[in-house]
Design a protein with these regions (language model features):
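N-terminal Rossmann/SDR dinucleotide-binding element
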Residues: 1-104
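Conserved mid-core segment of classical short-chain dehydrogenase/reductases
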Residues: 113-119
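Conserved NAD(P)H cofactor-binding loop of Rossmann-fold oxidoreductase domains
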Residues: 108-112
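NAD(P)-cofactor binding segment of oxidoreductase domains
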Residues: 105, 119-141
């Protein structure tokens, strides 16, 4: 389990203050794929931190393969009701947002581990491309 220390949140706060034009996300709905990965989880924590400390009122939609993994990863933040979960597998590009319409999409999902690239490079790149195409199709709706 990730330990959220005061020092950690101080770092998150410092990073959030360095992001140019971050106010454009205030009150918006943001879909994040790969929310439990290294980059995706950092983005989630920054946005939720800004909701709690600066009344950012950002609605965060976390898209991933496992609701329980997302709940476990963000267990100290999950009870605040700042985010929704959508099932998404980047390999399959199967995302149905239903009535949730994101203003922005942050695509951080990717089967990009070195083993996948070494053993199945074409399949890995196709998964990345088809996942991106599926997300772009959502924006066209």
């Amino acid at each position: 389990m990730l330990l959220y220390t005061d020092e950690y949140w101080n770092d998150v706060d410092a990073v959030s203050k360095c992001i140019p034009n971050i106010d454009k996300l205030r009150g918006r709905t943001i879909l994040i794929t790969g929310a439990t990965g290294m980059i995706g989880s950092a983005v989630v924590e920054i946005l939720l931190h800004m909701n709690h400390t600066r009344n950012f009122h950002t609605k965060v939609i976390l898209a991933g393969r496992s609701r329980s993994r997302i709940a476990k990863r963000f267990q100290l933040l999950v009870n605040n009701g700042d985010f929704s979960f959508l099932y998404y597998d980047a390999d399959k590009g199967n995302l149905n947002t239903g009535t949730l319409k994101p203003d922005f999409i942050i695509h951080a999902a990717s089967p990009a581990d070195p083993h996948s690239f070494a053993t199945k490079p074409v399949e890995t790149m196709l998964a990345n491309i088809s996942g991106l195409v599926g997300l772009l199709d959502i924006l066209k709706m």
